[in-house]
Amino acid sequence: MTEAQRHQILLDMLAQLGFVTVENVIERLGISPATARRDINKLDESGKLKKVRNGAEAITQQRPRWTPMNLHQAQNHDEKVRIAKAASQLVNPGESVVINCGSTAFLLGREMCGKPVQIITNYLPLANYLIDQEHESVIIMGGQYNKSQSITLSPQGSENSLYAGHWMFTSGKGLTADGLYKTDMLTAMAEQKMLSVVGKLVALVDSSKIGERAGMLFSRADQIDMLITGKNANPEVLQQLEAQGVSILRV
């Protein structure tokens, strides 16, 4: 039996058992203790197994960290990363946050992952990521799965009133002096029902959407506590929003 054949049999044993002793290897391969230890050492050096006292164990394959496939192709990705980082700094330990769907929402959830905050979401890609990363406190809002948005929606919207947060972070397809616009009516209507039970509403809108109208009006400008946007946002619209009491943070 060649060395390569011995190595393959040893690895097959580990794949089945997870752990083998030097004695197991000697008996299975009919080789001397010195040869068994030498084979284990070589496979350990090549990273194919982990050498332990009196034997070897299989290397546990870590699950790849989940992230949306197209996240880095999202429009204005770098700006959205800055927006998410700034938003995460608003939240204090022990507080709860509602995070809705979209690329900026995912980036924000990623920033908050591992911090002592409760994250409430109906966005399944974010929920999956948080669970995969073992975030301590995740609440997934119930309802019917909406494939196009990768979210859950309560058909009557009544369940959303059960959830309350210190902060609600949301985005949209446009923001003007009139307010924040969203294009998906079902999503917008479900989120609207939560506006009365959250402490502060923060709009996360990249600069390309400032001054744009698209879809339905989700919230009036005077309902928005803070806007976090990019430095290239339309200054005229920002002034109009500030005049209505919206706090502006440009990043």
UniProtKB/Swiss-Prot annotation:
Sorted UniProt keywords: Cytoplasm, DNA-binding, Repressor, Transcription, Transcription regulation
Statement: the UniProt record of this protein carries the keyword DNA-binding: yes
Example of a GO cellular component annotation carried by this entry: cytoplasm
Disulfide bond positions: none
Gene Ontology annotations of biological process type: negative regulation of DNA-templated transcription
Pfam families linked to this entry: DeoRC, HTH_DeoR
InterPro entries, per the entry: Carb_Metab_HTH_regulators, DeoR-like_C, DeoR_HTH, NagB/RpiA_transferase-like, Tscrpt_reg_HTH_DeoR_CS, Tscrpt_reg_HTH_UlaR, WH-like_DNA-bd_sf, WH_DNA-bd_sf
DNA-binding region(s) in UniProt: 20-39
SMART domains: DeoRC, HTH_DEOR
Compartment list: Cytoplasm
Domain HTH deoR-type positions: 3-58
MF-aspect GO terms: DNA binding; DNA-binding transcription factor activity
Role description: Represses ulaG and the ulaABCDEF operon.
Name listed for the protein in its UniProt record: HTH-type transcriptional regulator UlaR
Organism encoding this protein: Salmonella arizonae (strain ATCC BAA-731 / CDC346-86 / RSK2980)
